[in-house]
Regions:
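Beta-strand-turn-beta hairpins that frame and shape the catalytic cleft
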Residues: 85-97, 178, 185-198, 217-218, ...
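Membrane-embedded segments
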Residues: 78, 88-181
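Structural motif
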Residues: 96-98, 125-127, 197-199, 222-226, ...
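Active-site metal-binding loops of divalent metal-dependent hydrolases
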Residues: 99-104, 130-132, 160-162, 184-185, ...
């Protein structure tokens, strides 16, 4: 279920009211200046008073941030590489790449760069954790891009909240080589070692999880879900790595505060990045795309992301 916490509601309202105040006052000052020029009013206009000059500077910086967030940051993919060591592997290591929240739109955004980066990383496994499409016109471009990803040990995916809504009948990942996972585990073997990849499709109500617990504790297990909302239910020795997305890292974040909104039941607790919850490592990926319209078509201090995990024996 998609939720928004009271704290997020308050922070979003404060942010919007602050924007309204700054740009509302700026509009009034500019209108006063223009009317004064039209009427040839004598005297110094408030537009050039020192406090107003400071306001102009803030407004200009804000416009610059919005332009950067729309035209620049959504295209600056961050490759976040991590090494996880485990006693559950003896000889072989696995390179796993996670993508999420592609939100492919009418206009191409990051698809070509995603393919170039991922194939250059030479992963063993690629996993995708939901929300693939914003507009049906991008369906073939999405499929072509995902089909071109090379992963010799397999490509696996789970559904996101958008995938069970508008696009449920489209067969979004048909012909891409990705295998949907829903309440099942696939064992991937390399050399003499193996890891388990399991997944749970998104549900609009709280999904019962009894059938996805109890994984073998002597094997390294990766769990895929769209949101971080199940982490405190499934964390434990049977789930070594929990991979998700959904939050976009807030998509718009503020310095020293972080995400304004995550649409997770945990609010800002697991907004983006790496967390250790009990015996489980959680990674919340910021994703590659933007919320569908009328959501904001900007990213600010929350760059699109590809996550890379090198899962290695402790001895390496």
């Amino acid at each position: 279920m998609i939720t928004i916490s009271p704290r997020e509601v308050v922070s979003l309202l404060v942010f919007l009211l602050l924007l309204l105040f700054i740009y509302g006052l700026e509009t009034l000052l500019l209108a006063d200046y223009v009317l004064g020029r039209v009427r040839r009013r004598a005297g110094k206009n408030a537009l050039f008073a020192k406090p107003c000059i400071a306001l102009h500077a803030v407004a200009i910086v804000g416009i610059g941030c919005m332009l950067y967030g729309h035209f620049v940051e959504p295209y600056r993919i961050d490759v976040h590489a991590m090494t996880l060591r485990t006693a559950k592997l003896k000889d072989a290591g696995f390179r796993l790449v996670q993508i999420t929240d592609l939100h492919c739109d009418k206009t191409a955004r990051n698809e070509e760069e995603m393919v170039r980066i991922i194939n250059g990383l030479k992963p063993d496994i690629v996993v995708a954790t939901g929300d693939y499409l914003n507009d049906v016109s991008a369906l073939q471009r999405l499929r072509d891009s995902l089909n071109r990803l090379h992963a010799p040990l397999g490509k696996f995916a789970v559904t996101g909240n958008l995938d069970i809504g508008r696009w449920v009948q489209l067969g979004v990942l048909d012909g891409t080589g990705f295998r949907w996972l829903n309440r099942e585990m696939v064992v991937v073997t390399k050399g003499g070692d193996s890891i388990g990849i399991s997944g749970l499709g998104f549900a609009r109500s709280d999904a019962p999880i009894a059938s996805i617990t109890g994984f073998p504790r002597d094997r390294f297990n990766v769990f895929l879900f769209h949101t971080p909302d199940l982490i405190e239910d499934v964390c434990g020795p049977g789930v070594d790595l929990y991979l998700c997305g959904h939050t976009h890292g807030g998509q718009v974040t503020l310095p020293w505060y972080g995400a304004l909104v995550t649409f997770s039941k945990f609010g800002k607790k697991y907004e983006s990045g790496l967390y250790h919850v009990g015996e489980t490592t959680l990674y919340v990926n910021r994703g590659l795309g933007l919320e569908p319209r009328p959501g904001p078509q900007v990213r600010f201090l929350a760059r699109p992301e590809i996550a890379v995990f090198d899962i290695l024996p402790e001895s390496q």
